[in-house]
Amino acid sequence: MRTLTELDKKVLRAEFPQLSFSEDADIDRYFELRSLGDQRQALDIYNRTLLVKYPQKERRVLLMSYYRKRDVRFKEVLADALAELAQKKIQEIKKIIDFFAAAVAPLDLTDVRTLIRVCEKIVRSISLNRFESVHFSRKHTHYAQWLLYREKEMEKAADIIRMYVTDTLSSVRTFRQESHTRATYGFCTEAHGTDTSSTIDFSQLVFTAEQVRTIEIAKTITKIEDRVLAYAIKYWHRYDDRAFENTVLLYSRKYKTHHYNIFHSIKTGRSHQWKDEDILHLVLAHVASGYYYSISGDLYLQRNWHWLKARLVERAEHHHQKGKKVPATHRRSSTPHARKTAGTRARTRARKKELPALPSEKISKKDSGESKQKDETAGMERVFRHNTKNVRTCSSRASRTGTHAEARHSDIVTSSPVHQEGAATVERSSPPEETVESIAHIVKRITGKDYGVYRELFFKEVRTAIRTVLNRATVRRGLRLRARKNNAEDTIYHFLHTHYDDPYQRWPNSHEYQQVHTLGFSIHSLEPIIVTWAESEGL
C-alpha cells in the first residue's frame, strides 16, 4: 500500500475539495442511485467523476467491487489510487507552470502588441470570464510554491495576467502586499516618494487612418439599430481575419471602446453558426448602454438586416468571381464591343439583375472595377448611411401596404430576353413579389389598431376562429375527423404563436402547412383566420 505524503494530500484537497482519504462519496452515491433505479444520474456520476479520478479500469473495477462487498482491502486500494491520482495531477500542474513560465514570464512590458496578443489568447483559452484567468494563474502560483518549482517565473506570469486584466500592476502589488485602504496606501507612497505602478503603455500604439476607417463607423449614424447594422456590415466577412482581429483588439484596449467585444460577438456567432438575429442581439447588447428593447426597433433591425445581408452576400460572390482566372480560350470575344446586338445587351442586363430593393429606394450603381472587398464594404456603408432615413420610412410603409405597394414603388425592373429568328426582342415585366409580413402586422393591417395591445386577446380567442375556418376548409372527411381537426387546430395555433413577430414567416412553405394539408384541410393563407377573429371581436 502506497502512503500519501502531505504534499499529495494538499494538492488533492485543492483539486477535489470534497475528497476523503478513507472513503469515496462518489462511489457511495453511484450505488445509491443504482439501487433507486436512477440509471441516468448514476451513469453521469460514473462518466464525469469516477472515470476522471480512477482512469485505470482494473483498479476502478476492483475498488468498486471491494466497496460493494464491504471488503477491508478497500482502503488499501483507495490509498494506492489516490497516490497515483496525486502524482498525475502534479505532473499536469508542472506542465501548466512550464507553459506560463515559457510563454508569459519572458514578455517585455514595453512590447505592447506582443504582450496583448499573447495575454488575450491565454485569457480567452482559460475561460470566457476574464477574471477567472486571474484566479487560475494565482492558484498555480501557490502550486509552484508548494512544489518548489519555478516559483519566481510563475509569480511573474501571474502578475502579468492580472495586470493585463486589470490594466495596472500596482493593483496586483497592492492586493498582495497591502491590507490597508486606498488612502493609507496613497499616503505611504507619497511619504516615500516612490511609485510602484507599472502599466501597459497604450500610448505607444499608433493607428493609420485606413485602420481607423476599417474599425470605426460613421459618427453620423446615431440610432442604436442603425449602429448595430453598421457594425455588422463592417465585421461580418472579416470574422476569421486574425490580423484584423488583433488590430481591433489593440484599438479597443487603447481607447477603452467596445469594438473588440462587438467583433468577438460576431466572430463567436458566425463560428458557431448561430442565427443572425442572435448575433445582432449580442451586438445590440454592446452598442446600447444599459437595458434596451423595442419591438418596433427589433422588427426594423430584422427587416433591414435581411436586405443588407443579401447585398453583402451578393457583393462577396461578385468579388469571388472576379478573383477567378478566365481561361485563355474565353478571354477574347468574337464580337467587338461596339457592335453588340440588342440580344447581347439584353443578356448583359439580365446578368446584372440585382435583388429587389426597398420601396422608394434609389441607389446609383457604379462599377468599381478592380476595387477590393474593403472598398465594397465601405461603399455599402455609405449607401446605408445615405438611405437610413428612406429605409426607416419605407419599412413602416411597406408593413401597411404590403406587396402591392412594393411592386408599385420598386425601381428595379427585371428583363428576360426572348430570341426569335432574325431579331432579338426583350420582354420586361415586374416579377411578383412575395409578401413579407409577420402575424402581428397582419393583425394590425386588418384591425387598424396597434397589434401589441391585442396580442393576449388574440391568442385567447383565436382558437375559435381557427375551428371556424377549418370547418370551411375540410377537403377529406371520414373517420377520426374530430381528432384530425384538433391536431390541425393545435398545429396552426403553434405556428401563429411561434411566428407572431417574425416578419419573414412563410406559411405556404412551412412544415406546419404540410401537416395541416396531410390531415385533410386546405388553408393556403392565415388571413381568413385573422379576419374571422377580428369580426368575432368586433374590431
Swiss-Prot record:
<feature type="compositionally biased region" description="Polar residues">
    <location>
        <begin position="390"/>
        <end position="402"/>
    </location>
</feature>
<protein>
    <recommendedName>
        <fullName>Uncharacterized protein TP_0793</fullName>
    </recommendedName>
</protein>
<feature type="compositionally biased region" description="Basic and acidic residues">
    <location>
        <begin position="362"/>
        <end position="384"/>
    </location>
</feature>
<feature type="compositionally biased region" description="Basic residues">
    <location>
        <begin position="318"/>
        <end position="352"/>
    </location>
</feature>
<feature type="region of interest" description="Disordered">
    <location>
        <begin position="316"/>
        <end position="433"/>
    </location>
</feature>
